[in-house]
């Protein structure tokens, strides 16, 4: 083996490993964010001591957890994520070996991206851009186009802003 080949081989394996690690971390953080949303919504609906925390629940949660990045803003986003994408529950349950978290609300399966495909192909930053769209078919359209065209978040944001969905 020549030195150049050795160096190229090591560089290549390092790049592949780094890429796989980034992808795995992103997938786990996406699933974590969904689970956080699930637990917050479940608590808001059924928590026996919820009256004690009331409208300050997320702020109190941030203070109690006291961990960088887990803050009121993220908790709001996670709650919305859970409500918009309830179908991800099965993926979260299997990945974290939790009891079946199932679907909380009714979502038409007609325009729903497979949760495993969604989590494996879109970053949470992509999902965050898409989940603010009110129309399920529009979300499905951007999820599909984003995966098909391999858009980065900036390009996705641009396509949403220029109403590609309406123009297509």
Where are these regions (language model features)?
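Basic, low-complexity intrinsically disordered segments
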Residues: 1-168
């Amino acid at each position: 083996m020549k030195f150049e080949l050795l160096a190229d081989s090591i560089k290549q394996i390092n790049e592949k490993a780094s890429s796989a690690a980034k992808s795995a971390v992103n997938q786990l953080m996406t699933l974590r964010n969904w689970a956080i949303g699930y637990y917050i919504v479940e608590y808001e609906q059924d928590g026996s001591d919820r009256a004690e925390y009331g409208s300050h629940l997320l702020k109190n949660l941030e203070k109690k957890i006291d961990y960088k990045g887990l803050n009121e803003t993220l908790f709001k986003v996670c709650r919305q994520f859970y409500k918009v994408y309830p179908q991800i529950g099965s993926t979260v349950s299997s990945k974290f070996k939790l009891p079946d978290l199932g679907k909380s609300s009714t979502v038409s399966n007609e325009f729903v991206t497979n949760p495993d495909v969604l989590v494996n192909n879109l970053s949470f930053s992509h999902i965050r851009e898409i989940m603010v769209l009110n129309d399920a078919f529009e979300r499905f359209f951007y999820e599909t186009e984003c995966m098909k065209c391999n858009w980065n978040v900036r390009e996705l944001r641009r396509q949403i802003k220029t109403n590609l969905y309406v123009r297509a």
